């Protein structure tokens, strides 16, 4: 493994509409082929739909709540010990937790059948707020894997 200097984290600028860095990261995950204006419109419109469905609430707060519901507490990592590979349960850092939650919500939204990405994203965010949907299922599967491999938790590093 290379022993290079530690690469500094890039600073994420806050969102122009709501002043939230989490929202900026989410827009960047939705973005395809560098079309940020399109991605922003999709995310803002989807959040408007979610706020209307929930009858109130702050846009950024609802997004954070959805991400909190979808983010996993534990995940499994492969660890090789004496020729055998074990799936070792490991706690998830908060940054990785939100990154995984965003990734899972975007993936689940892209697989949905509604017409237009805005409606698909709105549907997935609504489902995430109500603890249902594909992204929540992915979280539960991850937790189930960690629970099943709890016996190997002493291999943690």
From Swiss-Prot:
Protein name: Small ribosomal subunit protein uS7
NCBIfam families in the record: rpsG_bact
Domain of life: Bacteria
Assembly information from the UniProt record: Part of the 30S ribosomal subunit. Contacts proteins S9 and S11.
Similarity section: Belongs to the universal ribosomal protein uS7 family.
Summary of the function given for this chain in its UniProt record: One of the primary rRNA binding proteins, it binds directly to 16S rRNA where it nucleates assembly of the head domain of the 30S subunit. Is located at the subunit interface close to the decoding center, probably blocks exit of the E-site tRNA.
Keywords: Ribonucleoprotein, Ribosomal protein, RNA-binding, rRNA-binding, tRNA-binding
Species name: Hydrogenovibrio crunogenus (strain DSM 25203 / XCL-2) (Thiomicrospira crunogena)
Keyword Magnesium among record annotations: no
InterPro entries, per the entry: Ribosomal_uS7, Ribosomal_uS7_bac/org-type, Ribosomal_uS7_CS, Ribosomal_uS7_dom, Ribosomal_uS7_dom_sf
């Amino acid at each position: 493994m290379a022993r290079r200097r530690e690469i500094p984290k890039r600073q994420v600028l806050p969102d122009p509409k709501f002043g939230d860095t989490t929202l900026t990261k989410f827009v960047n995950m939705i973005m395809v082929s560098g079309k940020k204006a399109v991605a922003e419109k999709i995310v803002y419109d989807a959040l408007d739909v979610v706020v209307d469905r929930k009858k109130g609430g702050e846009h950024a707060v609802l997004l954070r709540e959805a991400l909190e519901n979808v983010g996993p507490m534990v995940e499994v990592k492969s660890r090789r010990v004496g020729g055998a590979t074990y799936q070792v349960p490991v706690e998830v850092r908060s940054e990785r937790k939100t990154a995984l939650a965003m990734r899972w919500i975007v993936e689940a939204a892209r697989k949905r059948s509604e017409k237009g990405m805005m409606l698909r994203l709105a549907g997935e965010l609504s489902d995430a707020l109500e603890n249902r949907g594909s992204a929540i299922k992915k979280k539960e599967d991850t937790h189930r894997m960690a629970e099943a491999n709890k016996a190997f938790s002493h291999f943690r590093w």
